[in-house]
């Protein structure tokens, strides 16, 4: 964001560059020039100007969704009024209806700031000047802070207008005071203000009315668009507002569980668990390696799959998984059912004690008396 002091409001064509400013943008000094154009258009006002003229004025200088805010302090406390695009034309018109014959804005040392899609103009020393011809010629100077946001496009229209009034002064020419110096009643009338905080009664009454009109803009727009009765428009708006209030908050998108990658064994062959441990293996958490067969693998080998961390998320699924591989030839249940195959195993020698059958119960009984007699 770039801030700079652009000086007082220029009164020259846009092709003329102010000395000392080296900024080269496609818009030149466009924000100041837009205020100059706004003042020039307001000077063209006549009493014959109707609603169409004011609507064209607002369309030229304000966005369709523009908001205008006025803040000031009266005897009964601070006031703040915010109106939308539909009510902005009537606001400027109310100033002239209150007795003003001329309106323009003077900016001293405004600061221009560039943002993504708009340009802001902040002037802490802004003066709104109005000329009044009735009941006596009076110049009203309203001092305050003006903050504007212009859309950064070819039209450079105002999106936000915020004028905060601090004080005001009402100036009367000395010649008029000299003319009525001998008239006490006239002097007493001249000493009274014709505005409140720089705003006429016509403008103040309109701003108070906007407190009611602004919320009704949705009803009026719906009535004009759908040709509904005022009661139906109110019911529809209230129902939609109620739906927005009771609508459940949108649930955050749940993240799909990451699929565990299959881990291949070093030999690339498959292994399967024994049939005797089917129930136990189902109750435990299996890894993909537990479904591999052991037909072509070296027997009695414990294989541990390496965890895959690249491309995955850290968590429980990234822990090292150790799978116990059961060899069917050492299964106790299989050994009981297939005793002959166990005894005829080539791993056992001919003189192995495992090949001799245990003596029967009758032979053991006949040997016992002999052993006792020898003793």
Curated annotation (Swiss-Prot):
Q: Which UniProt keywords apply?
A: Developmental protein, Nucleus
For the LIM interaction domain (LID) domain, which residue ranges apply? 300-339
* Tissues expressing this chain: Ubiquitously expressed in the early gastrula before localizing to the dorsal region of the vegetal hemisphere, which contains the Spemann organizer. Expressed in the CNS, pronephros and tail bud in neurula and tail-bud stage embryos. Expressed in multiple adult tissues including brain, heart, lung, stomach, intestine, liver, spleen, kidney, ovary, muscle and skin.
Q: State the PROSITE patterns in the record.
A: LID (PS51957)
Family per record = Belongs to the LDB family.
* Species for this entry: Xenopus laevis
Q: Which Pfam families match?
A: LID (PF17916), LIM_bind (PF01803)
Q: Where found?
A: Nucleus
- Tell what the record comments on domains: The dimerization domain is located in the N-terminus.
**What is the protein's quaternary organization?**
Forms homodimers and heterodimers. Interacts with the LIM domain of LIM/homeobox factor lhx1/lim1, and with lhx3/lim3 and lhx5/lim5. Activates lhx1/lim1 by binding. The stoichiometry of lhx1/lim1 and ldb1 is important for their function and an excess of ldb1 can inhibit lhx1/lim1 function. When bound to lhx1/lim1, escapes degradation by rnf12. The N-terminus interacts with the N-terminal region of rnf12.
Q: Which Gene3D superfamilies match?
A: Cysteine Rich Protein
Region Disordered: what ranges?
Answer: 248-294, 331-375
Question: Spans of biased composition, class Low complexity?
Answer: 266-282
InterPro entries linked to this entry: LID, LIM-bd/SEUSS
Q: How is it modified after translation?
A: Undergoes rnf12-mediated ubiquitin-proteasome-dependent degradation.
PANTHER family in the record, alphabetically?
LIM DOMAIN-BINDING PROTEIN
Question: What is this protein's record name?
Answer: LIM domain-binding protein 1
Query: What's a GO biological-process term for it?
Result: negative regulation of transcription by RNA polymerase II
Chief location bin: nucleus
Please explain the role this protein plays, according to its UniProt record. Binds to the LIM domain of a wide variety of LIM domain-containing transcription factors. Acts as a coactivator together with otx2 to stimulate lhx1/lim1-mediated activation of the gsc promoter in the Spemann organizer. Acts synergistically with lhx1/lim1 and ssbp in axis formation.
Gene Ontology cellular-component terms for this entry are: nucleus; transcription regulator complex
One GO MF term: transcription coregulator activity
